[in-house]
Amino acid sequence: MYAQPKLTSAEYVQHHMSHWKLNLHNFTFTDGGFWTLNLDTLIISVVLGALFILIFYIVARRATASVPGKWQNAIEMAVEAVDGTVKDSFHGDRSLVAPLALTIFIWVFLMNFMDLVPVDLIPRLFQMGGVEHFKAVPTADPTLTFAMSITVFVLVIFYNFKMKGAIGLGKEVLSRPFGWYLMPINVIFRLIDEGVKPISLALRLFGNLFAGELIFILIALLPWWSQFTLGMVWTLFHLLVITVQAFIFMMLTVVYISLAAESH
């Protein structure tokens, strides 16, 4: 973790917090405002998702009932832990929710884990290929965290309609929490309640990982003799943070779907 000598501290931070952008209007590597695709976020998230699927597939193919290996033990522990958590929170059919929760936890954890990679390593590798900016932590990008939270929001709506039907959901929205006589207020409260969920889900994950990445970058600006000590301390603490944030995102997803699936 070392700073480029030609950059000032402010320029170094700005450089490492900038994305590799694709303008979807003209397909050039420029900022297109709303129509901008962060290629670094897309590449890292897809690669980590593919890695997750590949590892689980290989371990599943080689699974044995006799003497399981280290990878099989680790994956079985993760699957059992997530399934137990889902079982405690979701009391309906878990055939979709449990695999979804496992996928969210592992995928988000892997993306969070990129925050522990030395801040100059991956950007420097891409610079060798002509890419000026590359931000290697997908969950420090609000476009990804909002995309994930909106997907969860869509699932919540789906389960609301599936379990309650259009009429049942309509009655619930119009009559709760203050009764039929205050229908307009009930609708406003429901819109606020549902709208806050994806926003808070996205910003919580983004804020924690963005702050963690920024601290690693600031540590990289310090003298070499202090980088190792502070870097190790922050790495050990941040390892807990990235795990907890992955668990929270998974847990809130399960809770939101469980609340939507409850039949009243």
Swiss-Prot record:
One of its GO terms (cellular component) is proton-transporting ATP synthase complex. Pfam families: ATP-synt_A. PROSITE patterns: ATPASE_A. NCBIfam families: ATP_synt_6_or_A, PRK05815.1-1. It is found in: Cell inner membrane. Belongs to the ATPase A chain family. One of its GO terms (molecular function) is proton-transporting ATP synthase activity, rotational mechanism. This is ATP synthase subunit a. One of its GO terms (biological process) is proton motive force-driven plasma membrane ATP synthesis. CDD domains: ATP-synt_Fo_a_6 (cd00310). F-type ATPases have 2 components, CF(1) - the catalytic core - and CF(0) - the membrane proton channel. CF(1) has five subunits: alpha(3), beta(3), gamma(1), delta(1), epsilon(1). CF(0) has three main subunits: a(1), b(2) and c(9-12). The alpha and beta chains form an alternating ring which encloses part of the gamma chain. CF(1) is attached to CF(0) by a central stalk formed by the gamma and epsilon chains, while a peripheral stalk is formed by the delta and b chains. Key component of the proton channel; it plays a direct role in the translocation of protons across the membrane. Keywords: ATP synthesis, Cell inner membrane, Cell membrane, CF(0), Hydrogen ion transport, Ion transport, Membrane, Transmembrane, Transmembrane helix, Transport. The chain crosses the membrane at residues 39-59, 97-117, 139-159, 205-225, 239-259. It is a multi-pass membrane protein.
